[in-house]
Amino acid sequence: MKLWQRNTIGAAVSVAACAVIVTTDLWPDWANYREATHTDNVVAVGAVGDADGQTWQVDSIRHLNTVRGIGGSGLPQGTVLNVVTVERTGTPTEIGCTGVITDGERRWSAEAVGGYGDLPPQGISSICGTPGPVQFSFLLPDDVVPTAVDVTTAQGRILVRLQL
């Protein structure tokens, strides 16, 4: 067999091996990453949208400089607590979810109710496993202008992006 034939066979085997590695090892991680940063389920400002068998809409956004509830502690210097209440109807299909707020470049996860999270009013939940409205609290630097809230599954997949 000539040298160029061996080189051609070697190149073909290398390309096939790379394709197998990308398909079996890298592609699932890349797909998980894409699901955690991009979604087709986007609800415009003031609109109502359908996603994951439910309807979603931003009900209210509050900006707080103290936390209600146990202790009512002050927030760290240079921060503000953004409290977003999301109105939703339908039966939740996910046992758990959380909120992630973004300014288009950076992302912040919702605070726990026991931390800086604001206590939800009667009739509003801080967990997604129950039907009805849900509230997310985000401790952000005071110069951040959030553009959207992503409601994500426990695995990080975005269910719906609610533009602010």
How would you describe each model-predicted region?
Residues 1-83, 87-164:
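Conserved functional micro-motifs across diverse proteins
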